Amino acid sequence: MSTSASSSYLDDETTWDSFNLDPRLLQAIDQLGFSNPTLIQSSAIPLALEEKRDIIAKASTGSGKTAAYCIPIVNNLLTDDSSQGIKSIILVPTRELSNQVFQFVEKLLTFSTNKINVLNLSSSYSDQVLNSLLVNKPEIIISTPAKLIQILEKNEKNIDLSTVKNLTIDEVDLVLSFGYLDDLKKLESYLPVKKNLQTFLMSATVNDDLDDLKQRYCTKPAILKLNEDSANQNNLVQYYAKTTEFDKFLLAYVIFKLNLIKGKTIAFVNNIDRGYRLKLFLEQFGIRCCILNSELPINSRLHIVEEFNKNVYHLLIATDETNELNEEQDDDEDGDEDTKDKGNAETKPKKSKKSKFKQDKEYGVSRGVDFRNVACVLNFDLPTSSKAYIHRIGRTARAGKAGMALSFVLPLSEFGKHKTASLASAKKDEKVLGRIVKQQSKNGFEIKPYQFDMKQVEGFRYRADDAFRAVTQTAVREARVKELKNELINSEKLKRFFEENPQDLASLRHDKELHPARIQSQLKNVPQYLLPESARQDVKNIGFVPFHKNKIHKHRKGKGKGRKKVDPLKSFRK
């Protein structure tokens, strides 16, 4: 969800006035700077407002899907004179996206806040505060499916959803892949599904998994599939570089220290330890970066995203644990192809994979979250599926802006040669790359190989070796604990203070150095001889500098000057 869309997505022939929206809503839209509706908005809004149709919409990232369902919801509430009650429920897959949608709805209500109340259930409210807010019967509730069901089961008598007129599920495919289908089935018993319930199902991809939700919640829906991928095709450039396990860190050091990428970068890693190892490695060279992962408190995660969008941070190391959700599906597809190739060959039954991560289930950064003006997505660790790759690179080249995606790929022959820098999922990098290239070529995209000039990079290797040796497993564990303690303090104890003093929130930074066990301050400066000639600065000639100081010259220079006026030997008296 982005607050603005590219001109390639705009429908110049349609104006906001043509939708007969409430004047207060039109004023808020104008304040947001929306000149014209996008293609998805000009198609969905009339169907929702005039024909009262259920809508299943597929549109690419940055095309304005969030506004396409939020504007009809707000407009209907502004013109609704019925009794107070919960009228609309918006479900999203992650807490980050829940907060993002909440902020956008608040902007649409700038000139009508007294009439409509909005509640974000995914915020870190205490049970007592949440119950008091629910008693007021907010018109719009925004939540993840699991959180909503949890609250409904605890407060079934106090929450009445019989007045709900609209149900929206955003990023449907991700909601289903997160395992929320059971929660959505439970929700059916609380909602007036058989009455006049309008449903919006929004996603960047539409597949067969939607059939169950379609049968449960939709009645003769309008299905919108807008092929807008070609709009971004010329704006996104994709590269991959084959490298060794340690050279990933070496290349990251060279790229960020020499500022080879102009603009903001998101570096994706596949687990939390990996993120802290990269941060500890880079900070020894004075490269400031912040970490985003599922262990951090929700308030800290939201603040990091906000500050990144405000250009406070230029390098964000994001842990993408959700990419493992699609690994099994890719393996199954690959297994089907292998079966066809082998013909009558025997196939062993595949063991079911168990989920290994124990972090916040409602965390997600590779999909839906509005990272603004990202120049580059660096897949420091290649994702484990082609679907996860598409979600990651969708963080750049958004809303018609240019972007680049660079992926480090480990050849199978290099796997396991550097144990400290090794990653288990990298063993399948070449296999996954093949799937990614195949998938992207189907969509008309090309992934080009990128060759680094290793002769120029080689001079930095000894410095990278020194820095990497300092990042031990103990240092990673200590940094992880230290970061978590700091963020818990910032998130809980200072929350009320920052609400009363918002100007002091700017001083709260998430990119402070965590410091490994051994600090090497000399690594922060790059000697001129290591830099390529084009990057070297002209050094002024200060003349000959002797190795030793000329003490004789210094002695003669002081000769001839008078002694002190008072000589203690001569002035001494018996």
From Swiss-Prot:
Q: Which residues lie within the region annotated Disordered?
A: 324-359, 549-574
Q: Domain of life, per the record?
A: Eukaryota
Q: Which UniProt keywords apply?
A: ATP-binding, Helicase, Hydrolase, Nucleotide-binding, Nucleus, Ribosome biogenesis, RNA-binding, rRNA processing
Q: What class of enzyme is it?
A: hydrolase
Motif Q motif: chain residues: 14-42
Q: Which InterPro entries match?
A: DEAD/DEAH_box_helicase_dom (IPR011545), DEAD_box_RNA_helicase (IPR050079), Helicase_ATP-bd (IPR014001), Helicase_C-like (IPR001650), P-loop_NTPase (IPR027417), RNA_helicase_DEAD_Q_motif (IPR014014)
Motif DEAD box mapped to chain: 170-173
Q: What is its EC number?
A: 3.6.4.13
* Biased amino acid composition, Basic residues: 549-564
Domain Helicase C-terminal: from-to ranges: 235-455
Protein name, entry field = ATP-dependent RNA helicase DBP9
Q: Give the organism the record lists.
A: Candida albicans (strain SC5314 / ATCC MYA-2876) (Yeast)
Q: What is the lineage of its organism?
A: Eukaryota, Fungi, Dikarya, Ascomycota, Saccharomycotina
Q: Which gene encodes it?
A: DBP9
